[in-house]
Amino acid sequence: MASALNSKINPPGTCQGSKADGGAGWRMDCDPQMHVKMCKKIAQLTKVIYALNTRQDEAEASMEALREAHQEELQNAVAETKARLLQEQGCAEEEALLQRIQALESALELQKRLTEEALAESASCRLETKERELRVEAEHAERVLTLSREMLELKADYERRLQHLTSHEATPQGRLPQESPETKSEPGQGPEMQEVLLEVQRLRVENQQLSKDYARKAEELQATYERENEAIRQAMQQSVSQALWQWQEKESDLRKNFQVQESALQAQVRKLEGDLEHRGRKISDLKKYAQKLKERIQDLDVQLKEARQENSELKGTAKKLGEKLAVAKDRMMLQECRGTQQTDAMKTELVSENKVLREENDLEAGNLHPQQDQSCLKECPCMKGGTDMQTKKEASAETEYMKQQYEEDLRKIKHQTEEEKKHLKDQLVKRLEDLVKKHTVEIKSVRSSVEAERKKLQREVEAQLEEVRKKSEKEIKQLEEEKAALNVKLQNSLLEVLRLEEFIQQNKTRPTGAEESPQELGRQHCSILETQDPCLKLDETSPRGEEYQDKLAAEEGTSSDEEERTKVLLKEGSDPQPPLGSLLKEKTSKIQRLEEDWQSQKAKLQAQVSQMQQALEQCTSNYREDLQALKQLSDLEREKLQRELQETTQQNHAMKAQLEASHQRALRMLEKARHQELKATEERLKKESSHSLQIQHQTHRLELQALEEKARQELQEERERMQAQQALLLESLRQELSEQQAACSGHQKDLEALQAELRALGRQQASSQCPGDSKDHIIATEERGGPGQAGSPPGAAGQGSGEGCGLWEENAQLQDAVRRLRAEVEQHQQEAQKLRDQRRFLEETQQAQRAREVETLRQEHRKEMQAMVADFSSAQAQLQARLAALEAELKDSGEKPGKGASRPEDLQLIGRLQTRLKEREDIIKQLTEERRFHYAAFPSAMSHRNRSFSFNPHPGYLTPSMKKKKVEDVPSRVVSVPNLASYAKNFLSGDLSSRINAPPITTSPSLDPSPSCGRTYKPNQSTDAKTATRTPDGETAQAKEVQQKQGSPHQEWFTKYFSF
């Protein structure tokens, strides 16, 4: 075991000393390099950590500086916004603007209301005219219906009388054959027959008279209708002209009012626009400033975030690098420990191997010879050299392995660092997105808060403006009340002064009137009371009358004293007469006292009057100043209003021009839209009809193809079956013929063989006889053997003839068989011909059935086309109604034509009414002409019923022959213009709704695939008298259809059809 291990570890040619020296050299070579690399990495990491720390400090300092600047800018912005809001709070013009806007809105509402009233009046007038037209038409229709009914009653009565007379005539004619021939030969024929004939003549005269009366009544009704129509037309023209004149006057008045209002409104609107522009500029400036602040805040926030992110990144990278350094140090320590352990283990192994080798060598040296010892001694250095080389190789391999591991570790570390960088970048991006979202949310919240604050401030400003406005209104009302009170005071003071002057003059003129002094004092007292009452009232109403309350109380006291004195005097006057001296003394003393009191009162009153005058002068001066200020303000407002009026007038003119242009554009657009809609509907209907026709044609073709294929398949199957049968028969016949031919060929061969034998026998007989030799011998021989020889050839000939007969019989049988076969072939041919005839008959029946199916499909197609045309007419009616509604809306929206000119709507209405009247006059004239023609042809068709008064729901179909022609013959194109006969028919039948609706429309031949669609209309000439006397309605309808079939242009019926 030990030798085996030694051989594995130490191969031959190695030595212990070399191995130990190699391991120590490798350790000395590797340790300094690793140490230098580790020192370099540690130095790099320390530099990075120092740089990161310095960057972090700088970022924190810059963040603090940015935060301080941001706070300062925010404080400045808040201060500026507060100052501007405080400045804007003092603006009290918004209320005036709101009032003006309200006034403008009220004026606009009034204008709209007036326009709506005018449009309602116009609509009512139009409705009245339409009602009048409908009423007149209904009355005329009722009259015509009554006349037609009378005529029908007369006709029915006439027919009853004729039937009665014919029945009476029939009874004597039945009795006449029973009478004798003598009575037949009588010339008189009886008085009853003469009476009957007279009655018939009388009835004929009555019928002619009735027809004349009916024609006369119809003419009279026509004349009355024309007169009424003319009167209605004149009245309508007058009413329309009056209504137009009234509408024009109203429009001119309304336009004047509107122009005045528009001028005022335009001025106010311009002023408001200027104010709004000024305020909008202010608001835009504030918004710009706020936006700048927000942008600055955003920039600062972004810088802060970037600095924080850089700081966090630096911290993270520093931490990671520290961790990586620790890991690298641990790895290096572990690698060093492993290397030392490996070198120690190798040293111990080498030492143990050397010891083992030495012991073995010692043992072998004692046993072996000296030669062997020498040889062992020679081999030992070789072994030692081999082991040294092996150890060196192993050390170099281990160093390479260590280097590879180190490089792999470095690569792994780099890969991990790159992955961590990517992960950090992703995290940074996510955090940036989250921060951006948060920042947007914060910005939105800040904006919403700013908007809420702005709205709150605006509301506060509006509330303050409202309060200021209310206060100013209250102050103005108080000033007006004070002004009124002062005016009243002035008037009362002037009255009082005048009364005092009068009283003074009266006292001067009559100083001696002692008796009248009490009365004068009473008057004075009353005047003073009268003057006091308004003064008291004025003091109560006016806020400045508190100064005069004391004076008025003093005056009241003096007046009460005077009243008491006057009462005492009056009492003394009522006493019995005292002595004259005492009376005189008392009177003189009283007069003196009264004079003194009067003078004192006069002085007091003059002082009061002077004070009142001064106060009034002051008040008047104050109010004059106020009035001047108010006049200035009013002048300014007048100027502003005049400017606003001018601006509003200009704006109104511009707006009017714009409105007219827009109205015209709208009308053009509506007309274009209408035409486009009509074209679109027409194209759509054409496309739908063509598409449906194509689909129907395709379905018909597919059905026809399917039927043809089915018939072909059936015929093919029948042919194949018949061919198979014929082929079988022919094969059987061929087999029989081949058998018979084979038999015939066998018989012919037999015949040929027999003929050859006969010829051979004949030749033998000819060769056996010799000419000229011993004729006797020949004769003898003939005599002897002649009968036998002669008997032998006839026997052979009899046999040949029997065989020939048999062959002839067989040939005859074969010929009979051939004849039979020919007869059978002919029979088979006849059967084939019958089958062909049957096939032809089946084909003909199938074609007839197919034609019937095609005819039914065509009829269904025609019905569908009629339904489509009816849908088209209904759609057209809807379009007409829609167009009428659009025109009504346009008319209701109202155009503003020039002054003095009639509106185009009214002119169009008048033109339409005139055209309608002309059309109705033409219809009436044509009806009268048709009636004259009818009554001219009436006596020849007396026994026939008048078809013009038949209540037929289909106006174009009058007679059965005409019905057949209408159903059978198809017109050349779609007729959508209502003819005059159908219109007259509907008019006479009393169906007023049929005038509006179109007549029944026939199908288009261009869409009909039948071959008869291109034929022109040719009326069938019948010998019947009933069909010969056609009504004029049918003739007019035929004439119109013939004209249409002769090819009137497409545009003509289109314009007629779409002329509304």
UniProtKB/Swiss-Prot annotation:
* Alphabetical UniProt keywords: Coiled coil
Q: Which residues form a coiled coil?
A: 51-159, 192-333, 402-502, 584-769, 806-934
- Region Disordered: start and end of each range? 1-24, 165-191, 532-566, 681-700, 762-803, 994-1050
Which InterPro entries does the record match to this protein? FAM184A/B_N (IPR039478)
Polar residues composition-biased segments: 1-17, 994-1009, 1018-1030
Composition-biased stretches, type Basic and acidic residues, lie in: 536-554, 681-690, 773-785
Indicate the family of this protein: Belongs to the FAM184 family.
Name of protein:
Protein FAM184B
- Species source reads Homo sapiens (Human)
Gene encoding it? FAM184B
